[in-house]
Amino acid sequence: MQIFADENMPLVQQFFADLGDVTLFNGRNVTASQLQQADILLVRSVTQVNADLLALNTKLRFVGTATIGTDHIDQHYLAQRNIPFSSAPGCNAQSVTEYVLNSLWCLAQKYQWDLSKKTLGIVGVGNIGSRLARALQALNIKVLLCDPWLAEQQPGFEHTAFSQLCQQADIISFHTPLTSTGRWPTRHLLNADTVAQLKPDCAIINAARGAIVDNAALLSDLQAAVQRRAVVLDVWEHEPDIMTALLPYVDIATAHIAGHSIEGKARGTEMLYQQCCQLLQRPVKQSLDRLLAVPAMEKLQISPNFGLPDVQNLARLLYDVRRDDALLRCYLHSHGFDWLRKNYPPRREFSSLQLSGSLIPTYLPQLGFNLAQ
């Protein structure tokens, strides 16, 4: 069994070694000739899987992407060839949630916001959006939810139309897939017209897909703004050749790494491994818990005085988003966008640290922290 996998998929050799021979490739530059002998193809979002890429392969049995998004996969083509496909929905939901929380706390510190007095609009209430909503609500932050598809599927879902959300929200965070067709296309959902509907100081966070936000329209808005608009961008149009003119106007700029916690990336690998085992009717022998390294900090005893400022400081100790902003600004021109992603420093999720104490804030589990039993 020939297994071809993106070189940036963590633990892929450890998970898949018992299923066949694992060959690693550069996901951005892989060619059809390289994949000619692949029985199993494992990719990330930088690889466009389509007829051109698979033109020379006649033996492919499975395609998997270790990501939540699937807009880089031609699923119609795979279906025509009867090639099973799987993604990893929810694999990095906690990682992205922690990225947004840390970004919000940084913005609150920078601009002296009281987040409890802000209204935060979440566009897209899937695995990530719903998890973020629970975390924010646990912190008593008012949340507006925008997801027209979910509104049709779930009676009682409190949906706020995007146009209404634009007018009411103090902060908007995008968590939708990227779609160009259908009833609710998301490509350039935030464009020149919709950005004009925002409050003058409404903050924008995009940790979903770059083209959800029209980057040129955003730049024009920021350049013309009389009042400072806070912006957090983890994803960009035309990656890896991003619009560098935006950087001076963006508070937190990162290289599409919101979901790049060790757990988030490795969880995607594990999910594809489980799918392959099921497809091949092989027993599941490996698990993420067994393969993950022991974190640098395992346990922390907290006192009854442990409050939200301490939570924020602890979160920054585990992951400081300002580090990734500094890395992008320092190395983008000399090393490039993909280099930043490939050489991303290890980052553990909140759950890697077990908290114990006599009086623990009830909202900590909703943020993702692990409490001692």
Language model region names:
Residues 1-38:
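N-terminal glycine-/charge-rich "phosphate-binding" loop or analogous flexible N-terminal tail
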Residues 10, 138-155:
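NAD(P)-binding Rossmann-fold cofactor-contacting core
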Residues 60, 116-119, 192, 201:
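Phosphate-coordination loops involved in phosphoryl transfer and adenosine-cofactor binding
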Residues 49, 151-244:
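Rossmann-like adenosine-cofactor binding region
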Residues 6, 43-44, 66, 173-176, ...:
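Short, well-ordered coil/turn residues at beta-beta hairpins
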Residues 7, 89, 97, 116-137:
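Glycine-rich adenosine-cofactor-binding loop
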Residues 201, 207-371:
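Rossmann-like dinucleotide-binding domain for NAD(H)/NADP(H)
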